Amino acid sequence: MSTPSSLQALTKKVLATQHISKEYSQSREYCHILKCCGLWWHGGPIMLSTNEDNQMMIKSASFKDGLELNVALMKAVQENNRGLIELFIEWGADINFGLITVNTENIRSLCRELGAKESLNKWEVLDVFYTVKRFKSSNNIILCHELLSNNPLFLSEDNVQLRRIINYNLRRISINFILDEISFNEKLTRFWYSQAVLYNLTEAIQYFYQKYKHFKDWRLICGLAYNNVFDLHELYNKEKVGMDINQMMELACIYRYNYSTIYYCFMMGADINQAMITSVIKSYICNLFFCIDLGATAFEECLEIAKQQNDIESIKILIYKNYYSPDSSLISLKITDPEKINILLDDETYESKNELIYEESHRY
């Protein structure tokens, strides 16, 4: 037979997960019930649900697109909200995550009572980072930044592996600052900002963009590097972009399969031959063929680079230059609409005309 405490927990879970009419959910009676059950946070009801990746999440008036359950716990701990701490633990949050944001002895004692360790080692802190960053919502990214970017446990120099991970993520796109000259706090901030752009989380992008305007061109840099043509288009059309279009193209070429942003820069007037050269320097065969599709003709210069790098695959491709020709179906469209570009260059349907020619010539 269920105990009163388990019945109470079950009742709260049912209330938090049920779907009711909008009219009743806003009624005074229903709101009173939720408040009495402790299902009220930041001026609104708490809802428990799962996202498309089957991850448990918390929603409320302040976090409408959801928080990963453990991130919600860390926020409740920071706010010293005993009721919500106990509630989120009942729903499956890991009490050890609370040690990241605990700031009073009373709440630390509560965490111990609920089974928390005395402290987290560097590997457990790293596990917290991996867990919370997997959840893709604007609310979650913003709160991760606010809770963790200036957190002593995350800033500790003992967390060598975490620092390596952040540095690795930033190093490939840190073109307008020297990584060794900025604090780890700023690196974490730039990392969370980049995640917002990577997953096109528009609310989070606007949050970081307004708050960190002194991070010169960082949003643009991330949009180019992470193939976010939607955000690139918004910036290029609505804001004054201070970066040269050829420098933008070079950034678009730093990752494989960045077809959408490469195409967009090309349509804005970037030099496709320079993009071809960058692709060969990086040994990105997919980008090389895409540049040829867009009419690039820098075969001789690229061949010299490939020979210097002893890049056998690129050499084989480049010596067949007389077989290739621009793909008129790409060039003639001259589109800059992000949605149309992504449809045109969809990963599952787009095939390079010249790559097919090369493969056909090497079939036998």
Curated annotation (Swiss-Prot):
GO terms for biological process: taxis. This is Protein MGF 360-1L. Belongs to the asfivirus MGF 360 family. InterPro entries: ASFV_MGF360 (IPR002595). Plays a role in virus cell tropism, and may be required for efficient virus replication in macrophages. It holds the Pfam family ASFV_360. The lineage of its organism: Viruses, Varidnaviria, Bamfordvirae, Nucleocytoviricota, Pokkesviricetes.
